[in-house]
Amino acid sequence: MNNNYTSLKSSIDEEGELKTDHEIDLEKGLLPEYNSEEEGALPTYSDHARSSNPPNTHRENHSSGTTDDSSPFLIKLLISFTPIVLLNALAVCYLTYKDAFFKDYGAAEWTLFGFWCLVCTLALIILTYFYETWTKAVKVTAIGLFNIRREMMIIIWILWLIICCILFGCVKDGRLNLNKALIYSTCTISAVLFLIVSSVCIPMWTLWRALSGMLQVLGIHGIIALLVNGSMSLFGKHFGWRGYEIEGFVLFFTGNALFLYEMERPGVLKRMRNTTGNVIGYILEGIGNIGNAIGRIGNAFRGANDNNDIPLGEMEVESEV
């Protein structure tokens, strides 16, 4: 019995199969071999592999459902609340200083207090709502100030010089009584200024160097003050207002100059201290050498006197020998 098998495929279909079996996709290259023993080892170009292993989407990477990288709401609220707290802290300090903090409040005062609370609440809402905007503005401003920190240091120093001149003028006119402690107030205010300048206009990695320079300058101030005032006290003298003004001005300008020089050239004060020690050592060594020279001269004179005391007969015996 002859089995006449007739293919239902047409010649066109067979040609298509030959083409699909032997043609190479120029973009994908050769098809990888399929290994049935490995689980899920489907060819790379298989549509089934694409459908069963879809690429990770943004939503899968963020399982919590958030679609942005913004800060959480509580952190935004806390950061927005910080400037309001600082502003209110200044107001509380001022009212406490005036002894008017929640003291003898009437209707007008309580109305003003309620209005202030409303303003703070609205400010908190606005700062929280526009968090990205104002934080970006603060960052841009901080970067701009950081880039012009040298110019800012000069501007702050000029403003501080004007403030000190006004302060000294008030002291001289008697409108501000510091009880002859002008030098100590100058040192204190200079220390506060150094701290502000070092924390605002100088990068944080130089903050320790700035504080170190400030302490060294204040140490120089203290040493000069102790030497001058101590020597005046030993002789029973005391500074008048003119003396305190001169001393305060001298220490103020020397302190500013030394601090700026230290910030521009790190280690200047340390080298100055070493140089001062070396100079003092050289001076003491010179004084010692002068003392030794004087001692040698004295020994020479003593030797000459001893030779003059020797009898003439002994000198003749020594010469014959």
From Swiss-Prot:
The name of this protein is Meiotic drive suppressor wtf26
Q: Which domain of life is it from?
A: Eukaryota
Which Pfam family, any one of them, does this sequence belong to?
WTF
Principal location class: membrane
- Species for this entry: Schizosaccharomyces kambucha
InterPro entries xref list: WTF (IPR004982)
| UniProt keyword annotations, A-Z | Membrane, Transmembrane, Transmembrane helix, Vacuole
Quaternary structure and partners: Homomer. Interacts with other proteins that exhibit high sequence similarity.
Membrane-related topology note:
Multi-pass membrane protein
Q: Which GO terms describe its cellular component?
A: vacuolar membrane
